[in-house]
Amino acid sequence: YVLGLVGAGVALAPLGFRPLGYGLFLLYLSALLASYLAFGDRAASERLLHPFHSPVGLGFMGTLGILLVLHLRYPWPFRVLLGLLGGAVLLLSASRGGLLALALGGAGSVLFQRRGWLALGAVGAVLLLAGTLEVPIAERFFQTHLSGREGLWLAAYEVFQAHPLTGVGPYLLGDGLKGVLFGECFLFPFLEMRGVACPEALKPFGGLWVFAHNHLLQALGESGLLGALGLLLLVGGFLAGAWGDGLLFSLLLAFLAMGMVDNPFSVPSPFRGEVFFLAGGMALARGFQPPLALGLAGASALLLSLPFLYLATRPAPPPPSLLYAAIPPGEGVGVVRLSGQGYRAQVWLCQRGCRRLGWEWDGEKPIVFAFPKDLPPGRYELRLVLFSQHRLAKKPRYVLPFEVKP
């Protein structure tokens, strides 16, 4: 599949990426429509949703649209509209990874074209708008937590430690990551919000779409050292082929930047990862420079490792303490308050198995959660799981159990 995409990219090199802009335009409109159908008048205060894209992925697709607009000569009305919609999607998705991709892609484009400065200006414009908008989602652009990715990174690294040479095989890493951020099987946020849970028949396969949220760790877990080396050489070859082309280089660099905190070029996908390999094929059609490819492969390895260097230098937070826990029987809701800074909290409800309640909370603020309405009566164990944001949060730092009767 990957080789076919690269070959298609070589064949489509004369055509370029102009058709992608029209597809992104339709994607943006469908995302705005889906969010309005899901949230109604609250759509502007909630993260953008799509039936088969996560908010993080939507933000990255917004970045791709902005980069296309800055480098390709679409008709002016469409060019302006696509750029505005791409910026709106990036802003409303509150995707810090998408913003990082735009910043790094723009910086890479500056090496060859002055238009790269416009991409960096777009980053500043998004941050300026986020700072002036009085909506909760805009605050995400100024937060430094990793939304629980630390736990996924650790789990993927532990799989790599157990299988350092060969990994566990393609699409099998997710079995070791299930339950870290979501349950055993999780569909797209839009579907889950609409009450479409993962069918029982799909639950054994839930690991197929659970990823490490870092491409280097994904490769190490799936394919071991040899596979990770192959991925880095492939990326280095793509970047070397794109050297000198502002659009191709910025697109590939944006994918690589996003690869620090997500898996944007995993395939098959809803035509996101496919764009990366098509771009790689177009880059290889321009030629191949082995020395430059090796150097850029090493730079890619360093870039994908930056999150771990960042975490390793963060100081340990002070131990937390429980201020109060109010979980009245039969009310269907609970509130827990902690003291202590630097923690992210997750709430899990366990009986025979465990299910996650809500998403994730800032440990410094009241943790308000609701119990599922279809919960069978009985006694349960409620687990408040606290992750720190330093040294990869190797395991949950603290687990506070409560016996509850929802």
Question: Where do the language-model regions lie?
Answer:
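Membrane-interface micro-motifs in multi-pass membrane enzymes
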Residues: L49-L64, S95-G97, A212-H215, L220-G224, ...
